[in-house]
Amino acid sequence: MHLAIVGALTLVLTLFVLHYTTKDDRCYILINGHSAFTNCPASPDLAKVISQLKPHNHG
């Protein structure tokens, strides 16, 4: 169950990154391990994705 949730979240984040990196304004989100950076303007969609990024433990 946990892997399904992680897989679904990964897919959503990948699609979100592709959506924003293909726009003409070069908005992007870089996700590296447990950190992320974006130059995207604030939006309700961006806030929704960021709210799903929660610290977690692999142990």
From Swiss-Prot:
Lumenal compartment residues: 1-3
Compartments (UniProt record): Host endoplasmic reticulum membrane
Membrane-spanning segments: 4-21
Gene Ontology CC, one term: host cell endoplasmic reticulum membrane
Positions in the Cytoplasmic compartment: 22-59
Cystine residue pairs: none
Any one Pfam family match given in the protein's UniProt record, by short name: TGBp3
This protein's UniProt keywords: Host endoplasmic reticulum, Host membrane, Membrane, Transmembrane, Transmembrane helix, Transport, Viral movement protein
GO biological process: transport of virus in host, cell to cell
InterPro entries linked to this entry: TGBp3
Family: Belongs to the Tymovirales TGBp3 protein family.
Functional summary from the UniProt entry: Plays a role in viral cell-to-cell propagation, by facilitating genome transport to neighboring plant cells through plasmosdesmata. May induce the formation of granular vesicles derived from the Endoplasmic reticulum, which align on actin filaments.
Note: TGBp1, TGBp2 and TGBp3 seem to act together for cell-to-cell propagation. TGBp1 is the main movement protein that physically cross the plasmodesma with the viral genome. TGBp2 and TGBp3 would facilitate TGBp1 function.
UniProt-recorded name of the protein: Movement protein TGBp3
Gene source species: Clover yellow mosaic virus
